[in-house]
Each structure stands twice: as structure tokens, then as C-alpha cells.
């Protein structure tokens, strides 16, 4: 089981955490949403729970809850800039289909 980050994603998360002034790492999860069923959730985490699995890559701790882990195993998080837009991009080998707008996915 693994969650990995690109160099640019790790740098961006570290910048966010430094600006925030505190935090254990980044929580990655999924929630029911959109036309394809699931959407990614990213948020800061100050302390993991007993049900969480913690991954570390490039100095960043990524926390995943037990329910989300089955859908996220093997995911790589990247941070990309495309024209005027920038944001995190998920490369998830478990995804079978995405909605047309890219906001949700199905495994």
C-alpha cells in the first residue's frame, strides 16, 4: 500500500504547512459526490487517529482513513500549473471511470 507525491506536490504541501504554522501533514480521502460517485478530499491534519494509515514521501506525511484507503492505494499526488490554473492532480490506478468534468470518479 502506498500514496506518493511528486516533487512539486511535496513542495506545495510543505509551503502550505509552513504558512499555516502547524500541522502533522495532509489528509487525503474520498467522499460521495458528483455524477460518478466519489470525489477527492484534501485537508490539513493536526493529529492522526488510531484508524488512520500514515504514509511519508519526500518529507510529507499523508494521512488516509481506513475507508478511503481501499480507493486510494497506489495514488500519486502531483501539483500542476496549466496556463492560469494550478492545483493538485491525482493519478489513481483504481479509477475505472471519471465524469466528463473531472470532478468525480468511480472505482
UniProtKB/Swiss-Prot annotation:
Q: Per UniProt, where does Fe cation bind? A: 35, 99, 101
Question: Which GO molecular function, any one, fits this protein according to its record?
Answer: iron ion binding
Write down how the cofactor binds this protein.
Answer: Binds 2 iron ions per dimer. The dimer may bind additional iron ions.
Q: Which UniProt keywords apply?
A: Iron, Metal-binding
Which Gene Ontology cellular component terms are annotated?
cytoplasm; cytosol
Task: Fetch the Gene3D superfamilies from UniProt.
Answer: HesB-like domain
* Positions of transmembrane segments: none
InterPro entries attached here?
Answer: Fe-S_cluster_asmbl/transfer, FeS_biogenesis, FeS_cluster_insertion, FeS_cluster_insertion_CS, HesB-like_dom_sf, IscA_proteobacteria
Any one Gene Ontology biological process term? iron-sulfur cluster assembly
Matching entries from Pfam families are given as: Fe-S_biosyn
Cofactor(s) the protein requires to work? Fe cation
Q: How does it assemble?
A: Homodimer; may form tetramers and higher multimers.
Q: Which PANTHER family match?
A: IRON-SULFUR CLUSTER ASSEMBLY 1 HOMOLOG, MITOCHONDRIAL, IRON-SULFUR CLUSTER ASSEMBLY PROTEIN
Describe the function of this protein. Answer: Is able to transfer iron-sulfur clusters to apo-ferredoxin. Multiple cycles of [2Fe2S] cluster formation and transfer are observed, suggesting that IscA acts catalytically. Recruits intracellular free iron so as to provide iron for the assembly of transient iron-sulfur cluster in IscU in the presence of IscS, L-cysteine and the thioredoxin reductase system TrxA/TrxB.
The similarity annotation says: Belongs to the HesB/IscA family.
Q: What is the name listed in the Swiss-Prot or TrEMBL entry for this protein?
A: Iron-binding protein IscA
Amino acid at each position: 500500500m502506498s500514496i506518493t507525491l511528486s516533487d512539486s506536490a511535496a513542495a506545495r504541501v510543505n509551503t502550505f504547512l509552513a504558512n499555516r504554522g502547524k500541522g502533522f501533514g495532509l489528509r487525503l480521502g474520498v467522499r460521495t459526490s458528483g455524477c460518478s460517485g466519489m470525489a477527492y478530499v484534501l485537508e490539513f491534519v493536526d493529529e492522526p487517529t488510531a484508524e488512520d494509515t500514515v504514509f511519508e514521501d519526500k518529507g510529507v506525511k499523508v494521512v488516509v482513513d481506513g475507508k478511503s484507503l481501499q480507493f486510494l492505494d497506489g495514488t500519486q499526488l502531483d501539483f500542476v500549473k496549466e496556463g492560469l490554473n494550478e492545483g493538485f492532480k491525482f493519478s489513481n490506478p483504481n479509477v475505472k471511470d471519471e465524469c466528463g468534468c473531472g470532478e468525480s470518479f468511480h472505482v
